[in-house]
Swiss-Prot record:
Signal peptide: none annotated. The gene is clpS. This is ATP-dependent Clp protease adapter protein ClpS. Residues 1-23 are annotated as: Disordered. Pfam families: ClpS (PF02617). Belongs to the ClpS family. It comes from Brucella melitensis biotype 2 (strain ATCC 23457). Disulfide bonds: none annotated. PANTHER family: ATP-DEPENDENT CLP PROTEASE ADAPTER PROTEIN CLPS (PTHR33473:SF19), ATP-DEPENDENT CLP PROTEASE ADAPTER PROTEIN CLPS1, CHLOROPLASTIC (PTHR33473). Involved in the modulation of the specificity of the ClpAP-mediated ATP-dependent protein degradation. InterPro entries: ClpS, ClpS_core, Ribosomal_bL12_C/ClpS-like. Binds to the N-terminal domain of the chaperone ClpA.
Length: 116
């Protein structure tokens, strides 16, 4: 936050009473920051079917078939792939949704988040 001090001096009633002297008025101006962003990443494994990964990308990250396939192949070939960049709360929710969905379907797919 930024602080601005304004000093006002003045005399009233002859200058020797309680109404004379210096007054400091502090005005505070809040400075907002953009929230930190987090990358949501899928990790490759040898057991989760490629079709399931594509389905996850379409369902939870609103990717079209071409983008989902491209990301899935990147995960398959490089071991990790980015699904999207979100604020902390959204990223945390996406990771939780993907992990729960993978467990429900008995796949070991891992999804993590990291600060960008």
């Amino acid at each position: 936050m930024r602080r601005f001090n304004t000093i006002m001096q003045g005399k009233t009633n002859g200058g020797n009473g309680p109404e004379s002297g210096t007054v400091v008025v502090t005005r505070t101006q809040p400075k907002t920051r953009k929230p930190s962003l987090y990358r949501v990443l899928l990790l490759n494994d040898d057991y989760t079917p490629m079709e399931f990964v594509v389905h996850v990308l379409q369902r939870f990250f609103q990717k079209n078939l071409d983008d989902a396939t491209r990301i899935m192949l990147h995960v398959h070939n490089h071991g990790v792939g980015e699904c999207g960049v979100f604020t902390y709360e959204v990223a945390e929710t996406k990771v939780s949704q993907v992990m729960d969905f993978a467990r429900q379907n008995q796949h070991p797919l891992q999804c993590v988040m990291e600060k960008k």
